[in-house]
Amino acid sequence: SGEMSAKNNDPLYWYTTTEEETLFAWYPSSETLLTEWTVASDQTIEESYKNSDFLYAYEKMKFRSERKLKFHHGTVKLIINVKGDGDTVSEEDLKDIVFTVSAVTKGSMAEGKLQSAAGVEATVMKPYLLENAREGYAYSFQLLMIPQDMSGKLFFKVALKDGRNFGHTPGNGEGILEGGHQYTYNVGVGKPGLKVTIEKDSVSWDGDDEEVEGTDRE
């Protein structure tokens, strides 16, 4: 959590006390209006992972409103914990595992919401490997994504060094990923395939939100 300050000192005026204004702000800042956002397909380096996120605020306010902008994460955060079943896939089998995610990496802003860009095909994404895996798991990964619906689409893929490959396709309505939310997937690799469970589906990812206050000007 840190401080944000506007670079432009030009104030925002309300012409009447009943007029409603739409305020849209984002960080990192840019000289032009934020209309689209792209996450890195290869997030194996921590810098690429962190640079895939942005904060934004979209509020409708009147002059007498409490003028606070609450910044939210624009992307989806995935935490993926992986282990073998201990029978058909051992911890040794998981060494040098290749875990990938298929998803659209380009999004567009509409009415203050980020959504996957139309007509863009899914890209193979590589997540960031955490130094310490969750207890009971061999590996833990993190990935930042554009909000989208992965229902009925190949989502995860696991490739083992012995040539075995596994995939996971969420069922109808099970792959909806909302911006500003964190999804923890616990993945078991083995027979007959991937056993995937979601831990506390759609938990709000608001731990780093910022509030910026305005001043009274008419």
What residue spans do the PLM features occupy?
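Exposed beta-strand face motif in extracellular beta-rich ectodomains
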Residues: E19-L23, M150-F156
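Conserved structural position at the C-terminal beta-strand
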Residues: Y27, V158-L160
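Short helix-loop boundary/capping segments
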Residues: K62, K70-H73, K77-M145, M150-K153
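Edge beta-strands of extracellular beta-sandwich domains
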Residues: T35-V39, N165-G173
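Intrinsically disordered, low-complexity repeat and linker tracts
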Residues: T184-E218
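Short, surface-exposed linear segments at secondary-structure transitions and domain or protein termini
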Residues: E3-K7, T123-V124, E174-V187
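Short, low-hydrophobicity acidic/polar segments
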Residues: S1-D93, Y137-S140, M145, E178, ...
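Surface-exposed loop/edge segments in extracytoplasmic proteins
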Residues: S1, S90, K106-G112, G163-P170
